[in-house]
Regions:
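Junction motif at the cytosolic side of a transmembrane helix
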Residues: 15-16, 178, 223-247
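Transmembrane helix boundary and interhelical loop/hinge segments in multi-pass membrane proteins
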Residues: 79-100
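Aromatic- and glycine-rich beta-strand/loop motifs that create alpha-glucan
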Residues: 1-29, 244-247
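Hydrophobic alpha-helical transmembrane segments of multi-pass membrane transport/permease proteins
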Residues: 18-47, 65-79, 189-203, 221-232
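Secretory targeting signals
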Residues: 119-167
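Alpha-helical transmembrane segments of multi-pass membrane proteins
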Residues: 13, 17, 85-89, 107-124, ...
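Extracellular/periplasmic helix-loop-helix junctions in multi-pass membrane proteins
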Residues: 181-187, 201-222
C-alpha cells in the first residue's frame, strides 16, 4: 500500500506539470457542459416549466441527463487528457523500465498509475456534477417548482459513473503497459463520445431508461462490472517480460 501511495503522489505531480494542456482540456469539459445545460434549458426545460402544471418526472429526467453528462465529461476528459500523455512520456523516457528494476510489484505500479489518473477525474467529475445540480436548480427550477432532486440521480452520478471510469482506467493502463499506448488511447478516446451519446439518445428518445430511476443506476453499475470482468480476464498479460517487450 505504501508503494501504491508513493506512485500515486509522484505520478499526479508529473501529470499536472503541463498546466496549459490541463487548462485547455478542463476548460473544454466545462464549456461542453455549459453548452449542453443551456441547450437543454432552452429546448426542453423552459417549455416544460411554462406549462400550467410542469411534469416533475420530466424535470428530474432532464436534471439527471445533465448531471450524468457532468460526471461523465469530468472523468472522461481527464482520462483522455492525462492517460495517453502519461503513458507515452513514461515509455519514451524509460521510466517504467527503471521501476521494473526495483522491488516494487508490477501490480502496484499498474494500480498506482491508474489511480493517479482516476483521482483528479473523480474530483473534477464530482465538482462539475455538484455545480450542475445547484446551478440548474437555482437557474430553472427553484423559482417555479422548488428544488428538484432524486437520490438515484445522485447515486448514478457520484457512484456508478466513477465506478465505470475506475474500471476503465485500470483497463486502459493495463493495455498501455503491456502493449502499445496508442491502442489504450483509442479505447479511452472512443469510449467517452460513444457512451455519452448512446445514453443521452436512449434517455430522450425511448422509455427504456429513466435517469432518475434505480434501473439506470443498475445499468451503469452493470457496465462497470463488465469492464471489471475484462480487466480480470486480461490480468494474465501483466508480466515484467511483456511490459519490457512492449517498448
Amino acid at each position: 500500500m505504501k508503494n501504491i501511495s508513493l506512485i500515486i503522489t509522484t505520478n499526479m505531480r508529473n501529470n499536472f506539470r503541463s498546466k496549459t494542456a490541463i487548462i485547455i482540456w478542463y476548460g473544454t469539459a466545462l464549456l461542453i457542459l455549459v453548452a449542453l445545460a443551456a441547450l437543454f434549458g432552452i429546448l426542453l426545460i423552459a417549455p416544460e416549466l411554462n406549462k400550467v402544471s410542469p411534469d416533475r418526472v420530466k424535470l428530474e429526467l432532464y436534471l439527471g441527463i445533465i448531471m450524468f453528462s457532468a460526471a461523465t465529461l469530468g472523468l472522461g476528459i481527464n482520462l483522455n487528457a492525462l492517460g495517453f500523455t502519461s503513458m507515452i512520456r513514461e515509455k519514451s523516457r524509460g521510466n517504467i523500465q527503471s521501476i521494473l528494476a526495483t522491488p516494487v510489484r508490477l501490480k502496484d505500479i499498474w494500480i498506482g498509475k491508474s489511480l493517479a489518473i482516476f483521482i483528479p477525474g473523480l474530483i473534477q467529475g464530482g465538482l462539475l456534477t455538484l455545480i450542475s445540480l445547484i446551478a440548474v436548480n437555482y437557474i430553472y427550477f427553484v423559482p417555479k417548482v422548488g428544488f428538484v432532486f432524486n437520490p438515484w440521480i445522485a447515486v448514478t452520478s457520484f457512484f456508478a459513473i466513477p465506478l465505470i471510469y475506475f474500471c476503465l482506467g485500470l483497463l486502459v493502463y493495463l493495455i498501455g503497459l503491456t502493449g502499445k499506448p496508442v491502442n489504450a488511447n483509442i479505447i479511452a478516446q472512443a469510449f467517452l463520445p460513444v457512451y455519452i451519446n448512446i445514453i443521452i439518445q436512449m434517455l430522450i428518445r425511448t422509455t427504456i431508461f429513466d435517469a432518475s430511476s434505480w434501473t439506470f443506476t443498475l445499468i451503469n453499475t452493470g457496465l462497470a462490472l463488465v469492464i471489471a470482468i475484462l480487466v480480470i480476464i486480461l490480468q494474465f498479460r501483466l508480466t515484467k517480460e511483456r511490459v519490457a517487450l512492449s517498448y
